[in-house]
From Swiss-Prot:
Residues 147-197 form the bHLH domain. GO terms for molecular function: DNA binding; DNA-binding transcription factor activity; protein dimerization activity. Residues 94-103 have a biased composition (Basic and acidic residues). This is Transcription factor BEE 2. Expressed in stems and flowers. InterPro entries: bHLH_dom, bHLH_ZIP_TF, HLH_DNA-bd_sf. Residues 82-91, 120-132 have a biased composition (Polar residues). Coiled coil: none annotated. It comes from the Eukaryota. Disulfide bonds: none annotated.
Length: 304
């Protein structure tokens, strides 16, 4: 490359600006500088020669074919423990000790809390086992359908059978009760029937008191047992015929009650002749209603 005049001048100026020491070094052979280095390290090179005898490999290093084995290790000399290091180790030991103490306290609290609950559970289990042991006083047998094995259930079954029999008897006595289904409806019909009988008896007693007030004293003296004995074994002969004649002579309503309108119309003519027969019939009819009433009521309350 051909340099211009200006480029040459710039290059010369740069070379002139270089330090004079560098120029001196370049101008000299360099012997003086080497002498300075030797004076710094020593004239006889004693220190450098000491490094020549330094072993290439340590005592613990193994050489294999001039190479250092990978398994070799450099052992450091043990360093003496100082007081500061001991304090640090003690602090590190105390920290886990405190943590273990806290854990032990928590475990103790948990055990204290679980002990009463475990005791309660054990008591409940003991009571359950004792109750199970005390319950079966009988030999438990698998019952078939419609049968029972317990004494209480057997007694309850017998009681229900008695109630059903008494209810059937009441159904047979009370008219129109066979059509009703259900015990509640049957009891309602029976109560209504007993109330109607009571009203009829009261009505008959009032009529008898109007016809002949002297009969009240005789009726009070008589008892229900005597009337029942009379109806179970009545006297034969004329008494039965007189009763049937008296029964035909008295007209009846549709409900079975006596029609006293005819008797009151002919009271002046026929009352004197049939006073004894009418009074006997009225007493017998009253006794009949009373006996029916007592039987129905006794059967009703025997169910309870």
């Amino acid at each position: 490359m051909d340099l211009s005049v200006l480029d040459r001048l710039k290059w010369l100026q740069q070379q002139q600006m270089v330090s004079p020491e560098f120029l001196q070094i370049l101008g000299s052979d360099g012997r003086e500088e080497l002498k300075r280095v030797e004076s710094y390290l020593g004239n006889n090179n004693d220190e450098l020669q000491s490094f020549r005898h330094f072993p290439e490999f340590g005592p613990d290093y193994d050489t294999t074919d001039g190479c250092i084995s990978r398994t070799s290790s450099f052992h450091m000399e043990p360093v003496k423990n100082n007081g500061h290091s001991r304090a640090i180790t003690l602090q590190n030991k105390r920290k886990p000790e405190g943590k273990t103490e806290k854990r032990e306290k928590k475990k103790i609290k948990a055990e204290d809390e679980t002990e009463p609950s475990m005791k309660g559970k054990s008591n409940m289990s003991n009571t359950e086992t004792s109750s199970e042991i005390q319950k079966p006083d009988y030999i438990h047998v698998r019952a078939r359908r419609g049968e029972a094995t317990d004494r209480h259930s057997l007694a309850e079954r017998a009681r229900r059978e008695k109630i059903s029999k008494k209810m059937k008897c009441l159904q047979d006595i009370v008219p129109g009760c066979n059509k009703v289904t259900g015990k509640a409806g049957m009891l309602d019909e029976i109560i209504n029937y007993v109330q109607s009988l009571q009203q009829q008896v009261e009505f008959l007693s009032m009529k008898l008191s109007v016809i002949n007030p002297e009969l009240e004293c005789h009726i009070d003296d008589l008892s229900a047992k005597q009337f029942q004995a009379y109806f179970t074994g009545p006297p034969e002969g004329d008494s039965k015929q007189s009763i049937m004649a008296d029964f035909r002579s008295f007209p009846l309503h549709q409900q079975g009650s006596l029609d006293y309108s005819v008797i009151n119309s002919d009271h002046t003519t026929s009352l004197g002749a049939k006073d004894h027969t009418s009074s006997s019939w009225e007493t017998h009819s009253q006794c009949l209603y009373n006996s029916l009433r007592t039987d129905s009521v006794s059967n009703f309350f025997s169910l309870k």
